[in-house]
A protein has these predicted regions:
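Aromatic- and glycine-enriched glycan-recognition loops and surfaces
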Residues: 88-105, 132-156, 225, 278-289
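Active-site-adjacent "subsite" loops/lids of carbohydrate-active enzymes
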Residues: 72-81, 87-89, 162, 167-232, ...
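Aromatic-lined carbohydrate-recognition surfaces of secreted/lumenal glycan-active proteins
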Residues: 159-167, 171, 243-250, 274-328, ...
Length: 439
């Protein structure tokens, strides 16, 4: 459905925001259907969604592989992004250390997380300061993480992209405390009841649980709120880009809520999967069309599911996890084709990919075939016992023609002590961030 049609259908519905995980599924089968891998996968502090699998499935042990001739000279133009999740820092000194170490290893982009679950790591008029910084939701920590990160990154010659969790909205069984501004959980519940969150196929709404709660991509107020949050960041901070994560539904059997049912029927029915993909793409398109022009030249990117469509039988439907297009209604290649995304970072890790160079290479090549003149940064997890595994994947991505890599994550690289290996190996020569000639 076009963005114009969506706006017409959504007219009169109050604008709202969301980024909630979801209620633990009512049955083991439904829990399994919610399998997820995200940019934050495998970090010890990361909390998965209910029923979420740690990675993608394998059908048995993956044989050892030998690769020859994968060495590749470092290009002069290459994106070298580093995911910096919000748990990587609590103090100004932490941020300075992050920038210093990344710069020393010749990274050139920091994907710096500033929104986790309806909270903020910057001065926001829409959402309260995160309680991770002070212990109290809404309390000013005495410094501004995003402002400092931008200042330090730019001084060191790095780009700073504000990294935003899109649909997760709260975390834990205890509701957010009172704050100024009021958290979206309380505000939206007061305005819309439970119809702004995702519902399962039994028409049961998500509720507070020990993991993420997730907002309804089809609720116009959710879309409006997320667009407003992104606009607020871009208008007030000198960011070089916006980076989206969790920009998808929570699984193939969400969201069967009254708002979605009504809007879907209003358009005359049809294929519900196509309609759900259009809801997510609507948000992406609005951010690109309405927010990016406020800061000309900035980039929009997203961490996306590692398997777009399962052409190889690697996904066992109904038992573990799904492909991005059909299981999470994330049409990332459609965004590239429509010109509403500058680069994607497929998260090429998880159990089905992590230990297989062949599968990594297959997926990288598959994404490059349909990149439509936009850019692909291969997402590589740093949690390998040997740095040679990371270097091999960087070289495979280069050979496939990827414009860059995104390494997950600062805390993993730091824990492994791989900074010197990056600097002495694949990132020995500094590189410029690739130009975006369509800008």
């Amino acid at each position: 459905m076009s963005r114009t049609v969506k706006l017409v259908l959504g007219a009169g519905v109050v604008v709202l925001v969301a980024v909630l995980g979801f209620l633990v599924a009512s049955s083991g089968q439904e829990a399994v259907e919610q399998g997820f891998v995200v940019a934050a996968d495998l970090d010890p502090e990361y909390l998965t969604l209910p029923g979420e699998q740690q990675g993608l499935p394998t059908e048995g042990p993956v044989p050892a592989e030998t690769w020859r001739g994968i060495g590749q000279a470092a290009p002069l133009s290459e994106g070298r992004a580093l995911w910096v999740p919000r748990w990587s820092y609590k103090t100004a000194a932490d941020v300075r250390t992050i920038v210093s170490k990344a710069a020393s290893a010749n990274f050139n982009i920091l994907l710096f997380q500033v929104r986790g679950n309806g909270d903020a790591y910057y001065s926001s008029v829409y959402e309260p300061w995160s309680d991770r910084l002070t212990g109290s939701l809404g309390r000013y920590p005495g410094w501004d993480p995003l402002a400092l990160a931008i200042q330090e990154a730019h001084a060191a010659g790095l780009q700073l992209h504000a990294y935003v969790n899109v649909y997760p909205s709260w975390l834990g069984v205890t509701p957010p405390s009172s704050s100024t501004p009021q958290h979206m959980f309380q505000r939206f519940n007061a305005q819309y009841g439970n119809q702004w969150v995702q519902w399962d196929r039994n028409h049961s709404p998500m509720g507070l649980n020990e993991q993420y709660l997730a907002a309804n991509p089809a609720h116009p107020a959710v879309t409006e709120h997320v667009v407003a949050v992104c606009r607020d960041i871009v208008m007030n901070y000198d960011v070089d880009g916006l980076h989206l994560d969790y920009v998808r539904y929570s699984g193939p059997y969400f969201s069967y809520d009254p708002v979605s049912d009504r809007l879907f029927q209003a358009q005359g029915g049809g294929d519900r999967g196509d309609w759900q993909r259009a809801q997510v793409s609507e948000l992406v398109g609005r951010i690109y069309d309405e927010v990016l022009p406020l800061r000309p030249g900035m980039a929009l990117s997203a961490a996306v599911w590692p398997i777009y469509k399962d052409k190889w039988g690697w996904v066992t439907y109904g038992t573990t996890t799904y492909a991005g297009y059909g299981g999470y209604f994330q049409d990332c290649r459609g965004w590239l084709k429509s010109g509403t995304m500058d680069f994607i970072a497929p998260m090429l890790y998880g159990t089905a990919v992590m230990n297989s160079r062949d599968r990594f290479n297959t997926l990288v090549a598959d994404f490059m075939v349909e990149s439509y003149g936009r850019q692909v940064y291969a997402g590589i997890h740093a949690d390998y016992a040997s740095f040679s595994e990371i270097e091999a994947r960087i070289n495979m991505a280069r050979r496939a023609g990827c414009q860059g890599q995104a390494i997950f994550a600062y805390s993993v690289v730091d824990g492994k002590g791989y900074w010197d290996e990056f600097r002495a190996g694949p990132y020995a020569q500094p590189a410029k961030v690739p130009a975006m000639p369509w800008k």
